[in-house]
Regions:
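Substrate-binding cleft and catalytic face of glycoside hydrolase catalytic domains
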Residues: 1-149
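Aromatic/acidic polysaccharide-binding cleft in carbohydrate-active enzymes
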Residues: 188-271, 282-291, 302
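Aromatic-lined carbohydrate-recognition surfaces of secreted/lumenal glycan-active proteins
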Residues: 61, 84-117, 161-193, 233-245
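Substrate-binding surface in catalytic domains of secreted glycosidases
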Residues: 128, 132, 137-173, 202-215, ...
Length: 379
């Protein structure tokens, strides 16, 4: 209450509770028998959670509950559906204001981590029970293409289903469950220090696992948030907030390292503070050399920000990753006179970026780090 939920609430964040199956999951060989005949218990458990933690109660610690995290195709599907129905109905009875979130799911064949929306959540009786479709997506290459099964690439890369997974989910939602929200509750990139990379062990050494650089982690996280903002999703949560500098998948995915900010921490903080009150408006340009998105502050069309970046990058298995690839670019047909240009922040200070502005155009350096171009209000 105080040390976990309270700190996030005081920071202005909402909390989502995940009812993990844990040792009652598929890793327990007797898990099916353990759940047999427990429908009433599932209902009461859901009701108790909602009553205590929910926004209608005294504690007001959470606003949503996810029913297990990643049961995937290893967890018996009819059993999961039964648990979901009972627990969701209990949550509704305990606090109808709580948003009920599915486990991780997507609109194609189930895998080790995600259920198939078309199978697990297509029944109209289940659709009416949930409010949010939960998606995990990583810019990972298909297994077998590289020595490591955990190789990741930049967000716009053509050799990953990173964005395709989300588009498929949106299409399924629009057709079968209109009105339901979509939350991306996991995405991210690992970046550890060279010192620990030299001491990899186990399969991470044998299969030559590699993360991205600290700068690339910042670039790819910000670009991911920007890309997600242009899609019909409601929320996106990065994974993870802190790491212990471990050279393994998910072991160095924090935006802080042992509690100390990485470049990605400053970049995400800047995005939050700079565009937090803005909303995606349109794609101005989108090609192999330039992504240019427009954001408006609320419904005020006079407060405009363009965000520009080069949609290029490196795969994590590439041993040599150049830190700075840039080119000069000129943009025309501007909405008004340029006011300021901010570089992506990677330290404690936000840095203005040089530009040359003439009548109706602006010239500046474009790189893989997004820049924020603000305009003066229209006269």
């Amino acid at each position: 209450k105080t040390h976990v939920y309270g700190k996030w609430i005081s920071g202005g964040f909402e909390n989502s509770l995940c009812a993990m199956f844990g040792s009652f999951g598929e890793s327990n060989k007797d898990y099916i028998s353990l759940w047999k005949g427990q429908e009433d218990w599932c209902f009461e458990y859901g009701k108790s959670m909602a009553s205590y933690f929910g926004p209608s109660g005294n504690e007001k610690l959470i606003t949503s509950i996810e029913i297990d995290n990643e049961p995937g195709n290893d967890f018996d599907d009819p059993l999961y559906q039964s648990i979901f129905r009972s627990m969701a109905r209990g949550i509704r009875a305990g606090d109808p204001k709580i948003k009920i979130v599915t486990c991780t799911a997507h609109a194609h064949q189930a895998d080790k981590y995600s259920k198939d929306l078309r199978e697990t959540f297509s029944d109209p009786q289940i659709i009416e029970l949930f409010d949010v479709i939960n998606v995990h997506t990583y810019a990972q290459l298909e297994k077998g293409l590289t020595k490591s099964p955990w190789t990741r690439t930049y967000p716009e890369g053509e050799d990953t289903t990173y964005l395709e997974v989300i588009e498929e989910t949106i299409q399924w939602r629009d057709h079968h469950a209109p009105g339901k929200e979509i939350w991306i509750t996991e995405f991210g990139y690992d970046s550890c220090t060279p010192r620990v990379m030299a001491n990899r062990t186990g399969w991470f050494e044998k299969l030559d696992w590699r993360g991205v650089t600290d700068l690339q982690q910042a670039q790819y996280l910000i670009r991911s948030f920007l890309l997600f903002s242009s899609m019909k999703v409601d929320r996106a949560y990065l994974y993870f907030f802190d790491d212990k500098d471990e050279p393994q998948v998910h072991g160095s995915s924090g935006i802080t390292r042992n509690g100390k900010p990485k470049p990605s921490f400053h970049a995400v903080s800047q995005l939050y503070q700079t565009l937090g009150d803005y909303r995606f408006s349109r794609i101005v340009q989108k090609n192999s050399q330039l992504y240019l998105f427009e954001f408006l502050k609320g419904k005020d069309r006079d407060q405009v920000c363009w965000v520009a970046w080069s949609p290029t990058g490196f795969r994590s298995d590439q041993k040599v990753k150049k830190n700075h690839r840039a080119t000069e670019i000129t943009l025309a047909d501007l909405p008004s006179k340029p006011d300021r240009l901010l570089a992506m922040q990677t330290s404690g200070e936000s840095e203005p970026k040089d530009f040359v502005s003439t009548s109706g155009s602006i010239t500046f350096e474009l790189s893989e780090s997004p820049v924020y171009l603000f305009f003066e209000p229209k006269q």
